[in-house]
Every structure is written in structure tokens, then in C-alpha cells.
Amino acid sequence: MALGLEDKKAIVAEVNEAAKGALSAVIADSRGVTVDKMTVLRKTAREAGVYMRVVRNTLLRRAVEGTEYECLNNAFTGPTLIAFSNEHPGAAARLFKEFAKANQKFEIKAGAFNGEFIAAAQIDRLATLPTYEEAIAKLMATMKEASAGKLVRTIAAVRDQKQAAA
């Protein structure tokens, strides 16, 4: 069924709003993936705070115009499934990467983060970004490690001073 002009404008506006509030975007080709599997992917995406939609390339080009995802324009070929991460920058990339492992026909095309185009081969850069909680945990571990090391060095320095004085 052909879309009317009003429907097209509504789609462009909806995707544009999603793009403006998103932290990152990933696009993929879902040809050959069954409806059941796509339904599971959509449900998982909603749970992960990822906006996901299949959009015509011409409408997608208009929707990302003026956003930091304009760099993806050259990758809009063939059927395009776009996902915007709303809560964590790596959420959509991680979701698509896991789904692609289980579904051979699902192909990640590209991604974008902070206006930078990320080719499909480097999508791991985006997928492996730590979540806020993981980053805080790593920071705390580093700080704890540093303070323990500093304590050991301080005690060793005090011991050396006492030995030198004796």
C-alpha cells in the first residue's frame, strides 16, 4: 500500500524526533529474517530503550537531515532498519550484534556516534562501550587500586626512613 503525503510527513517527523534525542544510531539490512525473529528483536529493543523502525531510504534521508546522523546517508541502500539508542550509546549496536550472531541473514550496515560514521567492521567500538554503571565500577576499581598502591608506597617510605635513622 502506497503511503500518502501526510503519512510520509508523519514518519519523517517521528524518526527526526527519535534522532534528535538519541545517543547513537545503527542501521542494518533485515532481508531474510523471519517475522517471528523480528518481533523478538523489536521486543528486546523496547526493553533496552532502543527506538527501532524500518523506513524507506528517501524518508530516512529527510528524517536525519540536520542531525548528527546525516553521516549515514551513503549507507541508506536497500531495505534499511534503523535503531536509535536512547539510554546508552552502545545499546543498539550491542542489540544488533547479538542478533546478527544468531541470524546469519541479518547484516549490520553502519553506525554513527557523535556525528562520526562507524563502518560495519568497526561496530564493535560502539557495541563494547561500557554502560554508566560499568564505567563507574571501573573508575572505582582504578581509584581503589591506586590508593592501595599509594598506601603501600607510603608505608615502605616510612619503613625506609626509620631504617635509615636507626
From Swiss-Prot:
Pfam families: Ribosomal_L10. InterPro entries: Ribosomal_uL10, Ribosomal_uL10-like_sf, Ribosomal_uL10_bac, Ribosomal_uL10_bac_type, Ribosomal_uL10_CS_bac. The keyword Ribonucleoprotein applies. GO terms for molecular function: large ribosomal subunit rRNA binding; structural constituent of ribosome. The keyword Transmembrane helix does not apply. GO terms for cellular component: large ribosomal subunit. It comes from the Bacteria. Keywords: Ribonucleoprotein, Ribosomal protein, RNA-binding, rRNA-binding. GO terms for biological process: translation. Forms part of the ribosomal stalk, playing a central role in the interaction of the ribosome with GTP-bound translation factors. Part of the ribosomal stalk of the 50S ribosomal subunit. The N-terminus interacts with L11 and the large rRNA to form the base of the stalk. The C-terminus forms an elongated spine to which L12 dimers bind in a sequential fashion forming a multimeric L10(L12)X complex. NCBIfam families: PRK00099.1-1 (NF000955). Belongs to the universal ribosomal protein uL10 family. This is Large ribosomal subunit protein uL10. The lineage of its organism: Bacteria, Pseudomonadati, Pseudomonadota, Gammaproteobacteria, Aeromonadales.
